[in-house]
């Protein structure tokens, strides 16, 4: 017999189950992704996990699709599948529902960095940043991209005023008139819920490292430099540097001199 459980209660039960087995950053990743599921459940009027079906999970996938890169969608759905399987084991959803979650198929070259960044590697990068580059621009950029799955162009277009620390939101907006358009225009405008850990990081970045220099349109970019808004190529270079194993592990996987 199924036990009536709200989506938030189910997520908290799942987090309690994994928090002693997985790294803190991995647990934070799972919590963030499942907050998106809770948000969708609220909008869809789902207040009991007993009513979750394969069709409803497909509706969630459709809701999430188009707002994030395919690799990010796959990460979100993988976490959702693990969560739903936990719910099956705890008599919260009907048996077999988890198997109905279809993950997108990745083709070679679809990921932004040409190589798939695994959760374990991302956890290593975040641990490195927490110790040695806390709240720097590079740390902030990577943490936002990894936890939200937004495109780098959307991140570049964020202003300081788009960050709502009180409600834990980042507001993504299409602003072509001031050189920060979104790839899919108004269709992908949205407010992204972020975890408390990321809220604190952004606040610390703004307090400790942000230059507070306006761009050519009088806007103050969230990801800013002393010259104003960061160029897309500079943003990508920061990501590339941080995700190189020789940077965050101090070891080269190809046995090269790490100074090269």
Language-model features and meaning:
Residues 30, 76, 137-138, 231, ...:
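Hydrophobic (often cysteine-bearing) scaffold residues that line and stabilize catalytic clefts
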Residues 157-201:
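Conserved tyrosine-mediated DNA breakage-rejoining catalytic core shared by Y-recombinases
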Residues 9-112:
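N-terminal core-binding DNA-recognition domain of tyrosine recombinases/integrases
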Residues 107-124, 180-196, 213-218:
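DNA breakage-rejoining catalytic core of tyrosine-based enzymes
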Residues 119-152, 217:
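Basic, Lys/Arg- and aromatic-enriched nucleic-acid-binding interface segment
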Residues 197-259:
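Active-site/catalytic core of tyrosine-dependent DNA strand-transfer enzymes
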Residues 27, 80, 141-142, 149-158:
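Alpha-helix N-cap/helix-start motif at helix boundaries, enriched for small hydrophobics
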Residues 137, 151-152, 190, 210, ...:
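Short, cationic motifs built from Arg/Lys/His that form the positively charged side of catalytic pockets
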């Amino acid at each position: 017999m199924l036990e009536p459980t709200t989506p938030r209660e189910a997520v908290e039960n799942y987090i309690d189950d994994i928090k002693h087995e997985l790294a803190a950053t991995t647990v934070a990743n799972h919590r963030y992704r499942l907050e998106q599921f809770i948000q969708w459940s609220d909008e869809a009027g789902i207040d009991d996990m007993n009513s979750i079906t394969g069709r409803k999970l497909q509706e969630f996938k459709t809701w999430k699709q188009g707002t994030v890169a395919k690799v990010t969608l796959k990460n979100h759905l993988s976490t959702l599948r693990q969560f739903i399987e936990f719910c099956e084991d705890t008599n919260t959803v009907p048996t077999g529902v988890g198997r109905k979650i279809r993950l997108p198929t990745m083709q070679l070259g679809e990921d932004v960095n040409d190589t798939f960044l695994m959760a374990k590697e991302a956890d290593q990068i975040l641990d490195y940043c927490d110790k040695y580059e806390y709240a720097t621009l590079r740390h902030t950029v990577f943490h936002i991209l990894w936890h939200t799955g937004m495109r780098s162009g959307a991140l570049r277009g964020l202003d300081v005023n788009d960050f709502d620390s009180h409600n834990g939101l980042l507001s993504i907006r299409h602003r072509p008139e001031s050189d920060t358009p979104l790839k899919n225009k108004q269709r992908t405008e949205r407010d992204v819920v972020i975890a408390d850990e990321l809220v604190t990081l952004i606040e610390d970045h703004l307090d400790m490292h942000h230059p507070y220099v306006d761009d050519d349109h009088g806007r103050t970019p969230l990801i800013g430099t002393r010259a104003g808004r960061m160029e897309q190529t500079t943003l990508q270079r920061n990501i590339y540097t941080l995700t190189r194993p020789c940077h965050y592990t101090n070891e080269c996987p190809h046995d090269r001199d790490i100074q090269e």
